């Protein structure tokens, strides 16, 4: 057998010619230590802040978020189970900053903080992704809030109105209806074209399921995205959930559309951030929160804005929720968020247990946007309401002493009692703006003064259905023209007088 060298070299040349090797370069490191959802990683020198790192384990890939970039190691918050990550395990850089899917593909879905679906409806076919952390629009990019965003709750729309692009805080103790206000507001956006994002942070899965079921029952899931970071999820996921939800809302804001985001609640997000920060050995400040906790909330809430006309005039409205302990509004996190937002709706346990629901304390609740977020019609009926109720609260305290009251004081007390009753509203029954105007008109113009207090809500319900039947043009004119002209005022007065005769008969 003869071996031909040139034949062999020819075969080798042909083999080499067809060989294509793809070189894949990835910067890797090693885990120095791991525990409590935090890993210290060595070797990923070009790692960026907020970059996703991959931890390959025998049970699949776990992702982590690079938070501390130190001289000799990187502090990583692990966004999943850390029990399979061992000391000395390999870590890979992804080169990607944390981002989430955005757009209409996410509507009606329940997702976690990193954009994975958790509703069992299959993968999300998103065409666009957006970074979780982006810089808020600058001063020139914005315009002042000038358009109402109705909550459907008479007490809020009349006295602490919310405008598109505003940040209005909902604050109060546990279990007094903070989430109920947020859910009612979402339900009320049904025909407004506003996309809603509900961010649940640190809540029980059963609570989130209940909210989702309520939204589904009222047909609100068609225009709502739910971002859930439950109580059992790692602190890192709870910390970035509001930013993830905000990125989804910004997509609509930047497209010239309108979005509403609810953070339920930022107290739990602050606690999660405190946990992560302390485990990363960042120095603690007041109440053991890290020094940048104010910045953490301000950079999130500043992303809610009303953009100017050149940028499409879109808006993102934020309703952050803060839970207080025994009504202490002067604690660290509540004071921080109050100073960042454009007003607050303060809910009070005493009112809640007295049956005033929504339990809004009129004196402590404000909207720093105010009349700019109201239509002319709403301003006309609600102008005196806040003052009347504040005076009623003062007089009520005096009336308890049982001293003889003059007629004017007695009349004011009677009006206040009826207005307080009129502002009560059952849960999941938001009211269109034109019906709110009609209802408040009846109260502020004295048409309820002779009605017994316990019959006020019955009067309101029957009066609105009477107007629907006999005078539908009143409601349609309020809706279209957004102002109560002298002619319309006369019609409204006539309708109410006619109904009062029927109601008492």
From Swiss-Prot:
Cellular component, GO annotation: plasma membrane; proton-transporting ATP synthase complex
Cross-referenced PROSITE patterns: ATPASE_ALPHA_BETA (PS00152)
Catalytic activity: ATP + H2O + 4 H(+)(in) = ADP + phosphate + 5 H(+)(out)
Example GO molecular function: ADP binding
InterPro entries, per the entry: ATP_synth_asu-like_sf, ATP_synth_asu_C, ATP_synth_asu_C_sf, ATP_synth_F1_a_nt-bd_dom, ATP_synth_F1_asu, ATPase_a/bsu_AS, ATPase_F1/V1/A1_a/bsu_N, ATPase_F1/V1/A1_a/bsu_N_sf
Binding site for ATP: 172-179
CDD domains membership: ATP-synt_F1_alpha_C, ATP-synt_F1_alpha_N, F1-ATPase_alpha_CD
Keywords: ATP synthesis, ATP-binding, Cell inner membrane, Cell membrane, CF(1), Hydrogen ion transport, Ion transport, Membrane, Nucleotide-binding, Translocase, Transport
Annotated site (Required for activity): 365
Membrane-topology annotation of the record: Peripheral membrane protein
Transmembrane residue ranges: none
Listed EC numbers: 7.1.2.2
Functional note: Produces ATP from ADP in the presence of a proton gradient across the membrane. The alpha chain is a regulatory subunit.
HAMAP family per UniProt: ATP_synth_alpha_bact
Family (UniProt): Belongs to the ATPase alpha/beta chains family.
Official protein name in the record: ATP synthase subunit alpha
UniProt source species: Syntrophobacter fumaroxidans (strain DSM 10017 / MPOB)
């Amino acid at each position: 057998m003869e071996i031909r060298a040139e034949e062999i070299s020819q075969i080798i040349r042909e083999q080499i010619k067809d060989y294509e090797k793809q070189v894949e370069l990835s910067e890797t490191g090693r885990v120095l230590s791991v525990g409590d959802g935090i890993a210290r990683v060595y070797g990923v020198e070009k790692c960026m802040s907020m970059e996703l790192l991959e931890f390959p384990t025998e049970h699949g890939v776990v992702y982590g978020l690079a938070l501390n970039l130190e001289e000799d190691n990187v502090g990583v918050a692990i966004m999943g189970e850390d029990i399979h990550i061992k000391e000395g395990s390999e870590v890979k850089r992804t080169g990607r900053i944390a981002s989430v899917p955005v757009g209409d593909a996410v509507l009606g879905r329940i997702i976690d903080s990193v954009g994975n679906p958790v509703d069992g409806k299959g993968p999300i076919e998103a065409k666009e992704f957006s970074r979780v952390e982006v810089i808020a629009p600058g001063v020139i990019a914005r315009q002042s809030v000038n358009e109402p965003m109705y909550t459907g709750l008479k007490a809020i729309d009349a006295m602490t109105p919310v405008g598109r692009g505003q940040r209005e805080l909902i604050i109060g103790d546990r279990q007094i209806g903070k989430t109920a206000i947020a859910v009612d507001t979402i339900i009320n956006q049904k025909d407004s074209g506003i996309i809603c994002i509900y961010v649940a942070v640190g809540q029980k899965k059963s609570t989130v399921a209940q909210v989702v079921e309520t939204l589904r029952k009222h047909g609100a899931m068609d225009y709502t995205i739910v971002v859930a970071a439950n109580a059992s999820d790692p602190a890192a996921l709870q910390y970035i959930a509001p930013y993830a939800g905000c990125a989804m809302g910004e997509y609509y804001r930047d497209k010239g559309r309108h979005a509403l985001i609810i953070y339920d609640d930022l107290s739990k997000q602050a606690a999660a951030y405190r946990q992560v920060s302390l485990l990363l050995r960042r120095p603690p400040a007041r109440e053991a929160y890290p020094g940048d906790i104010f910045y953490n909330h301000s950079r999130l809430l500043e992303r809610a804005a009303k953009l100017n006309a050149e940028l499409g005039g879109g808006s993102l409205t934020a309703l952050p929720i803060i839970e207080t302990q025994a009504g202490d509004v002067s604690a660290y996190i509540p004071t921080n968020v109050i100073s960042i937002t454009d007003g607050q709706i303060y809910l009070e346990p005493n009112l809640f247990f007295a049956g005033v629901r929504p339990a809004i304390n009129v004196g402590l609740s404000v909207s720093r946007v105010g009349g700019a977020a109201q239509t002319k019609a709403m301003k006309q009926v609600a102008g005196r309401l806040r003052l009347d109720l504040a005076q009623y609260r003062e007089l009520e305290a005096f009336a308890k002493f049982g001293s003889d009251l003059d007629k004017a004081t007695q009349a004011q007390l009677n009006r206040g009692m009826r207005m307080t009753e009129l502002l009560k509203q059952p849960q999941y029954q938001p009211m269109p703006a034109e019906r709110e105007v009609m209802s408040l008109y009846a109260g502020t113009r004295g048409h309820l003064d002779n009605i017994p207090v316990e019959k006020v809500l019955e009067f309101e319900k029957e009066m609105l259905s009477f107007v629907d039947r006999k005078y539908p043009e009143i409601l349609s004119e309020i809706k279209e023209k957004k102002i109560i002209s002298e002619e319309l005022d006369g019609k409204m007065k006539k309708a109410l007088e006619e109904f009062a005769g029927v109601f008492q008969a």
